[in-house]
UniProtKB/Swiss-Prot annotation:
Pfam families reported in the protein's UniProt record: Fe-S_biosyn
Keyword Lipoprotein part of the UniProt annotation: no
Subunit structure: Homodimer.
Keywords associated with the record: Iron, Iron-sulfur, Metal-binding
Biological process, per Gene Ontology: iron-sulfur cluster assembly
Needed co-factor(s): iron-sulfur cluster
Keyword Ion transport assigned: no
Cofactor note: Binds 1 iron-sulfur cluster per subunit.
Domain of life: Bacteria
Protein name: Iron-sulfur cluster insertion protein ErpA
Binding-site list for iron-sulfur cluster: C39, C103, C105
InterPro entries: FeS_biogenesis, FeS_cluster_insertion, FeS_cluster_insertion_CS, FeS_cluster_insertion_RrpA, HesB-like_dom_sf
NCBIfam families reported for this sequence: iron-sulfur cluster assembly accessory protein (TIGR00049), PRK13623.1 (NF010147)
Length: 111
């Protein structure tokens, strides 16, 4: 898998560092995945992992690693993972060039 196929922005990496610090575990990695559901057919999910799975692709920004499983990878190739703060709250977002439609909340999409 191409290591440049997904990008984690500096803002997202900074937030991951803050969350790792608050958990007291510098080995945590951000896992990004796609599941069926949501109002547009697919939903994005985020959680932390202590170690990669055998089929994970790893993407790096400085000392921050992002993991994507092989099934989710096909839906996320070319995407940018960012972190935004605004009036609507703070959250990780994905700018996905493969999505043909995106839900207003930004966490659901279709291809």
């Amino acid at each position: 898998m191409n290591a440049q196929a997904l990008v984690i922005t500096d803002n997202a990496a900074k937030k991951v560092r803050q969350l790792r610090d608050s958990e007291g575990n510098q080995d945590l990695m951000l896992r990004v995945y796609v599941t069926g559901g949501g109002c547009s057919g697919f939903s994005y999910g985020f959680n932390f992992a202590d170690s990669p799975n055998e089929d994970d692709a790893e993407f790096v920004n400085g000392d921050v690693k992002m993991l994507v499983d092989s099934l989710s990878y096909q839906y996320l190739v070319g995407s940018v993972v960012d972190y935004i703060e605004g009036l609507e709250g703070s959250r990780f977002i994905i700018q996905n060039p493969n999505a043909t439609t995106t839900c207003g909340c930004g966490s659901s999409f279709s291809i």
